[in-house]
Amino acid sequence: MENLIKQYDELQNIYGSKELNSVYGYGKRHNPKIALVFMNPTKRNIATNKSWTGLKAQWLGTKQIWDFLTKCGLFSADINDEIKAKKPSDWTYEFCEYVYKEVENQGLWITNLAKCSQDDARPLPDEIFVKYSHLLKKELELINPKYIFFFGNQVSSIMLEQQISVNTVRKKKFTLDINNKQYDSFAIFYPVGNGRFNQSKAIDDIKEILKK
């Protein structure tokens, strides 16, 4: 994983904001139940700040994603309540570790396809995501998840190497082949930001998939 982090940092200097740190996948390191793959980080994540010396994981200092995972039954409601009560500046290094200990306990690995932190949430072109796809495959191979959830049309299309419209493939199982090992994968509605209007569909689909 350390070699991947080095490569992610190099790509940050090419495709990300020069004022921000890259952030990485984190959670249950070995054999997680689910790998959750989002798009790319922005400076809303407090760990992207150059002065940050704590955990460099996804969604730190934000609220929407933790509320979403709680509604999916994949995160502690009590810890989510603590998050709701905090401003980004209230997130200490210790609290970030505490949040991701719960992620680990839930059997999750949370990552982004692109690790290049941006100043805002404007979408990245496909070409940049493609630069990260082989690295994400190595990351997924290392952690060996039971299921992979790709969030949004763009991430799903690039990683599954076919044109995906989540609305037409809800709950459909795809197979991602990495070095002759097959991983059960699903395309899920992007649940936050501009995708928040589809959040209830994403929750319903995840709950249904995990029942099987």
Where are these regions (language model features)?
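A polyanion-binding, active-site-adjacent surface
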Residues: 2-147, 153-162, 166, 184-185, ...
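A hydrophobic alpha-helix/topogenic segment detector
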Residues: 14-15, 171-212
